Amino acid sequence: MSISIESYGPLNSNYINRIQDTLNKSVNEYPRTMCLRIDLHLPTDNINNHNADSTLITRFIISLKAQVEADLQRKVCAGKRVHPCRIRHIWVREFNPDGKKHYHLVLLFNKDTYAYPGSYYCKEDGYMHNLSLMIMEAWVRTLNLHTQVNYQQHYSLVHFPGECYYHLNTNNQSFNTDYCTVMDRIIYLAKEHSKIGTDRQRNFGCSQY
């Protein structure tokens, strides 16, 4: 499988190996995998309260997993068929030219459980309860912003890039091509540029399973 990496500049080979290993574990467990790219930003005020980078992402994943488990339980109680979904993740910490931190993440789901993120826009009757909403809720709760009045204004701290999700199916004839397309997109997280290695905090992490 050839992977196009030229456009991202110097890449961290260890990050590449761990990204590929995490993706492989997902498709091995779930032959139909949905890969979702998101960006997480910090509020501009009280930014010093959010310096524990690895802990911050860990809390986000824990919150998201709890919401997914509750969502699946509601569906079971409603008599709907559900599929197991062990969420895997890959994250990197980066800095803008002005020094502001943000995080790029890849979230990997069982496509039989969540095939699409769903709309993340507010409709006239509010937000639809879908994967996007659970992700935005998880980040707001992680930052402890959910106690504020009108806390949904902070949902915009989660950014869903264009073409933010991809599907992989190991049984499709196009799997190798699709796999390379996904790797070409998410290997962006392995680029050396815009990361800081002098503050003794982690710039990269991924699921250990």
Residue ranges and their predicted role:
Residues 1-30, 112-209:
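Catalytic "initiation/cleavage/transfer" segments centered on a nucleophilic residue
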Residues 2-5, 14-15, 33-35, 45-49, ...:
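Intrinsically disordered, low-complexity Ser/Thr/Pro/Gly-rich regulatory segments
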Residues 37-43, 106-111:
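Short loop/turn segments at strand-loop or loop-helix junctions that form parts
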Residues 88-115:
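Histidine-centered divalent-metal-coordination microenvironment in nucleic-acid enzymes
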